Amino acid sequence: MAFRAQTARLYLSALRHFCRMAMRKGLLTSCVWQGAELPRVEKRHFALTRNELDQLSVLDVHGTRALARNLFVLSAHTGLAYIDLKHLTPQHIERDSSGAWLTMPRHKTGQQAMVRLTTATLALLDKLPKLQPCATGWLQVPDNRTINRHLHVMGHTLHLRQRLHLHMRRHTFATLMLQRGVSLEAVSTMLGHARVATTQRYAEVTRQKILHELGQTQRAD
């Protein structure tokens, strides 16, 4: 039986963990994993195109499936991670003369994420079911396995190129922002990344980006 590199790494990582635990309990006197580091496996990130995201947004679904879809779309327009959706409260929505902003510290890094909210995103946020009271979280967010199960079905319905899952939301957000010409530094701030280098893994060159830049070059010539 053959495994993909990432799957093999996960199994080896679990084996290393249990070997080290056995050593701490005195069940093993030595461990081949002592001091060993598993090589990182670079994963290719996938994003929805603007057209695919629009198709998903208007797909006729109901109940928990509609909730899963709307949470995905909200994240694709704000860059929020799953855990940040669970901790979102009304206090994270600020309004000034320039419009509405979502500002909140990322749960994973503590870095401040800051995204301007469009009218459409605010409308989507308004129609999502809310929790009462909302001291630790405002939105009703199902567990990620439930969301992924519904996303997979919807992706199959839309004949998407890749299996639709939660991890595609932030990559979709970053890719669409970069295609609009937003700088890598600005996208990094929106995502709440501590370093721009972290954002660069989202900045895969897309066909739309190449055509856009070729068009600019040809006009300049």
Task: Cite the ranges covered by each PLM segment.
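Short basic/aromatic active-site micro-motif
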Residues: 67-68, 141-144, 161-180
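C-terminal catalytic core of Y-nucleophile DNA break-rejoin enzymes
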Residues: 42, 107-127, 132-153
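C-terminal flanking helix
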Residues: 16-19, 23, 206-210
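N-terminal core-binding DNA-recognition domain of tyrosine site-specific recombinases/integrases
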Residues: 1-20, 63-64, 141-145, 163-165
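C-terminal catalytic core of tyrosine-transesterase DNA break-rejoin enzymes
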Residues: 24, 73, 77, 83-84, ...
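Basic, Lys/Arg- and aromatic-enriched nucleic-acid-binding interface segment
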Residues: 5-11, 24-82, 86, 131
